[in-house]
Amino acid sequence: VDGHRQDLSGGLPPILVAIDTTPLRQTRAGTARYLRGLLDHLDVPVREVSFPATSRLRTVAADAIWYPRLHEDGADVLHCPTFRGPFSSRVPLVVTVHDLAVLRRPDWFNRWTRTYSRLAVPRVVRAASCVIAVSESTKRELVDLLAVPAAKIRVVPNAVEDVFTPEGPRAEGDYALAVGTLEPRKNLQRIAAAVEGELRVVGVRGWGGVESPPNVVWLGEVSDEELARLYRGARCLVYASLYEGFGIPVAEALACGCPIVTSTGSAMAEVAGEDATYVDPADVESIRAGIARAFRPEPRRVADWADVARATQAIYEELAG
């Protein structure tokens, strides 16, 4: 991404910001939604440069080659939107941390992710000039688990796309909705057991086998427009995850005015405040009771991606200065 400082600061020399877009491979995952929202709203010209690396080992090898080259190519700032990044950097490094689940519960992840993260996460965060946390909850964990100085962390909450509003078509039927990459921490087995009637599930399959209960309708990946229809028509969103650093589906449902059932702890209360029904994600009866108590909130937006882009661009400006 070519970021021109004169666009914001009255004719100062241009800066060049390199952004690792590898997470876009995950399509609908939260990290991909974050990166897509950021890239779409940065007020700078964008130039895409491709480095082929299809396997994990080739990706690591490519990182070893291309990250050091950024300084030679004149980059002023490097932004890694996940933990994947250099262990040292001659260019000021920005790292976005979405959560620390891989350190808190490594058993939720496959062997490659566990091994790589145990090695990489502390080193990448240590190398960063600035760490962006998507919530105050994630900031606290960075301080507590990795001893990151609080002054090095900026909290920039996630946002939702403009399509998520209460106005518009609704999906038909009587159903509860679950949204997210299908992996153990998303707690789908308990959610399905708690839902009486149809549960529609939006998301790609991640790691960890998930059996298909008879009341579950798998929708896979859907467009934002279709997802907004599903939020508007749902009896409620059931987002009883065992752990989250933010929870973009909660923010999307809130923007659509969809009733929300979500977990105590993690960052969900930070996102939804008093506009959700909170449950114990480890207790099926608690989730079932929460679904029965769910209420329709007054629609509101946590933030817009333009806000996220402005805050992030200000960090680039500061580090390049």
Segments predicted by a language model, with ranges:
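Carbohydrate transferase catalytic cores enriched for Leloir-type hexosyltransferases
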Residues: 1-321
